[in-house]
């Protein structure tokens, strides 16, 4: 799977939000751990196989959930969800650009998009200040919804985020 890039040309670091890309990481970790510690190769391979099965399962659950959303477009404050969008046939639009708050021009473009596409929700992460997201939601007559891409339980969190997005979209 290729990395995503931002308009500025930088690489999108939010790769962990793609179960299919995480599978590549799990396989690489198991391979390297087995090479470094051959006595436990079987354990690493079994643990990897178990986790890969969980990733396949959650990928299918997310795919099924997001297939039925009314809108295939969503707006976020911080552009962390591009891999989710790419993997599941959605389009992410972000207020923040290159780590900076949106300019007045970009905000207006996003307001126009939200109104044209009837997007009534903006997702934001618990790690960021939500004031611009809240002001944006007020402008479009919508609401903000918090997602937690850094939550501790990865599999459960992916399911929770997909359920939240499905309900909101």
Locate predicted features.
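Extracytoplasmic metal-acquisition and chelation regions
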Residues: 1-169
């Amino acid at each position: 799977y290729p990395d995503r890039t931002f308009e500025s040309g930088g690489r999108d670091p939010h790769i962990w939000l793609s179960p299919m890309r995480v599978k590549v990481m799990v396989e690489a970790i198991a391979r390297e751990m087995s090479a470094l510690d051959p006595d436990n190769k079987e354990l690493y391979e079994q643990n990897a196989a178990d986790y890969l099965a969980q990733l396949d399962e959650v990928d299918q659950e997310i795919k099924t959930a997001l297939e039925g959303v009314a809108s295939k477009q969503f707006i976020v404050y911080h552009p962390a969800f591009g891999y989710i969008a790419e993997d599941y046939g959605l389009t992410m639009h972000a207020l923040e650009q290159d780590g900076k708050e949106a300019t007045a021009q970009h905000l207006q473009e996003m307001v126009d998009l939200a109104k044209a596409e009837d997007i009534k929700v903006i997702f934001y992460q618990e790690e960021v200040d939500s004031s611009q997201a809240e002001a944006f939601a007020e402008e479009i007559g919508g609401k903000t919804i918090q997602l937690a891409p850094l939550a501790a339980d990865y599999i459960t969190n992916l399911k929770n985020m997909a359920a939240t997005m499905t309900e909101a979209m």
